[in-house]
From Swiss-Prot:
GO MF: endonuclease activity; nucleic acid binding; RNA nuclease activity
EC number per UniProt: 3.1.27.-
Active-site annotation: H40, H144
Protein name stated in the entry: Ribonuclease 4
Keywords of this entry: Antibiotic, Antimicrobial, Disulfide bond, Endonuclease, Hydrolase, Nuclease, Pyrrolidone carboxylic acid, Secreted, Signal
Gene Ontology CC, one term: extracellular space
SUPFAM superfamilies hit by this protein: RNase A-like
Subcellular location: Secreted
Amino acid sequence: MALQRTHVLLLLLLLTLLGLGLVQPSYGQDRMYQRFLRQHVDPDATGGNDAYCNLMMQRRKMTSHYCKRFNTFIHEDIWNIRSICSTSNIQCKNGQMNCHEGVVKVTDCRETGSSRAPNCRYRAMASTRRVVIACEGNPEVPVHFDK
């Protein structure tokens, strides 16, 4: 009886560990996707001015401990952004081949160089331009803004 109980416990432990191994990668990818959304996606705005950058950088928690020097907000529907992941693979800045490019409306926010966290100040530049994003998963989702 004790031997049978031990086998059942070992089997449950094995299944639990196996399950954790399968869940972790998708959880990590989901975290990276959520971070990408928080840092780079603002579909309802047109952006384009310094006040927008100052507010959004603070609101999206990129000025808490230090002033993030540069960030880009994409002003497109998330499905339009995700569709970039279905374009041909190109090489990322880090050498990996999981990047894709597309043309989108953006606001680039550049730190002025004279501010200190949490009161960071930014200069805005709105444009429609080519962007490169890294995508991962199945289906692929954006996880990193490359350039």
